[in-house]
Amino acid sequence: MTRTSVLADALNAINNAEKTGKRQVLIRPSSKVIIKFLQVMQKHGYIGEFEYIDDHRSGKIVVQLTGRLNKCGVISPRFNVKINDVEKWTANLLPARQFGYVILTTSAGIMDHEEAHRKHVAGKILGFVY
């Protein structure tokens, strides 16, 4: 089976481990995008600590789960989003206002939609977490 998206596989593994009540999950392979996505999730308290393990191949990440995550997912293809259109995307993807985050990749890095609005940057939509 071919991997279409490493990020989608990682978030799927986190979702499945969270649903089964696991305390930690191993993600491999890893990438810089996955690490930045996890940093945003960690900043908002959806996951605990995570550790990158360099095995001289593609690397592994061990993520500690807190039980606070309901769902996370990838938006594919990565649509271009203007600053004014971010609100429409959050309304479509998230279950309620002020609940969850849409994660964007911008010229200023990977961040959630609120931080992108504060910095007044737009970019491509990566995924969501709530």
Curated annotation (Swiss-Prot):
PROSITE patterns: RIBOSOMAL_S8. Transmembrane segments: none annotated. SUPFAM superfamilies: Ribosomal protein S8. GO terms for molecular function: structural constituent of ribosome. Keywords: Ribonucleoprotein, Ribosomal protein. One of its GO terms (biological process) is translation. GO terms for cellular component: cytosolic small ribosomal subunit. InterPro entries: Ribosomal_uS8 (IPR000630), Ribosomal_uS8_CS (IPR047863), Ribosomal_uS8_sf (IPR035987). Belongs to the universal ribosomal protein uS8 family. There are two genes for S22 in A.gossypii. This is Small ribosomal subunit protein uS8. It comes from Eremothecium gossypii (strain ATCC 10895 / CBS 109.51 / FGSC 9923 / NRRL Y-1056).
